[in-house]
UniProtKB/Swiss-Prot annotation:
EC number: 2.3.1.180
Name of the protein in its database record: Beta-ketoacyl-[acyl-carrier-protein] synthase III
Lineage of producing organism: Bacteria, Bacillati, Bacillota, Clostridia, Eubacteriales
Pathway the protein takes part in: Lipid metabolism; fatty acid biosynthesis
Molecular function via GO: 3-oxoacyl-[acyl-carrier-protein] synthase activity; beta-ketoacyl-acyl-carrier-protein synthase III activity
Length: 325
């Protein structure tokens, strides 16, 4: 089986909308400061819903869109940096919530590039013939790991989830992937878990599990790899950039996307943008965007799409997709 198709999409965001004006009551900021630097106008924040809750709701919508039964899914991969717990995995919790009792399940952490890594991994499993139908979810409740006193980070992120169902098919819907990592930049975007504390160690106290970021370094890295990754994946696909109908970037910052578009010689009309409504939802941004495009009827049969992401690790990745629905 060499052909894999996306047969359905779904997404879910919490009901609570937090505007830039709301953020100005928490930290020293303003709508003008946030929107001019990031393009973000508002974000969704979870109230008593955890990462698996958002992921399961997005998954159920993708299942409905695919017109399949949960029991037909035999693989679930969840991309997340904000799991409910160290164990069990979010994927196992999602499996139970949606009734996909026949699926093997695991989580994958590649930060904001996680969904691309997960989608590529799932497609490779299907191409080997080991699995037939996979659910790939990007889901985050980043609000629980934000430093709400750091205006440089807390204004950027939001909570949300997106999902796709992929299956072996007659047409090749996942044409090519290009993935990369650079651990030397690990401290540029960082969220510690816990110190090594046990009866035999000298370590005292817990690490602060909050996101920290070197914005200047992340910006430079993001523009660089976004441009190089898009060029490489298109070239490796045997296509030209003119063949691409849409580029769906990780929705982190409008300035990053604008700089990359200029370096690629492309109009911003080529890029699908929804970060103004959701902020940076890390591993959820790309599947959330794909589902929104699907629901709006923007994706016509045969359309070619490049998805491109970048994030902590450092990690980056891009894929060329063909819409076959």
């Amino acid at each position: 089986m060499n052909s894999v198709e996306i047969i359905g999409t779904g997404s879910y965001v919490p009901e609570k909308i937090v505007t830039n004006e709301d953020m100005s009551k928490i930290v020293d900021t303003s709508d003008e400061w946030i929107s001019s630097r990031t393009g973000i106008k508002e974000r969704r924040i979870s109230i008593n819903e955890n990462t698996s809750d958002l992921g399961a709701k997005a998954a159920l919508r993708a299942i409905e869109d695919s017109n399949i039964k949960p029991e037909e899914i035999d693989l679930i991969i969840v991309a997340t940096t904000s799991p409910d717990s160290y164990t069990p995995s979010v994927a196992c919790i999602v499996q139970e919530k949606i009734g996909a009792k026949n699926a093997a399940c695991f989580d994958l952490n590649a930060a904001c590039t996680g969904f691309i890594f997960a989608l590529n991994t799932a497609s490779q499993f299907i191409k080997t013939g080991e699995y037939k139908t996979a659910l790939v979810v990007g889901t985050e409740v980043l609000s629980k790991i934000l430093d709400w006193q750091d205006r440089g980070t807390c204004v950027l992120f939001g909570d949300g989830a997106g999902a796709v169902i992929i299956r072996g098919g007659d047409e090749n819907g996942i044409i090519k992937a290009c993935l990369g990592s650079d651990g030397t930049g690990k401290d540029f975007l960082h969220c510690p878990a816990t110190n090594v504390i046990n009866p035999f160690s000298d370590e005292k106290g817990l690490a602060s599990s909050k996101i920290s970021m070197n914005g200047r370094e992340v910006f430079k890295f993001a523009v660089k790899v976004m441009v190089s990754s898009v060029k490489k994946v298109i070239e490796d696909s045997g296509l030209n950039i003119e063949d691409i109908d849409y580029i769906v970037p990780h929705q982190a910052n409008i300035r990053i996307i604008e700089f990359a578009a200029k370096k690629l010689g492309l109009s911003m009309d080529k890029f699908f943008i929804n970060l103004q409504n959701y902020g940076n939802t890390s591993g959820a941004t790309i599947p959330l965007a794909i589902d929104e495009m699907n629901k709006k009827g923007l994706l016509k049969r045969g359309a070619k799409i490049v998805v491109v992401g970048f994030g902590g690790g450092l990690t980056w990745g891009s894929m060329v997709l063909k819409w076959t629905k």
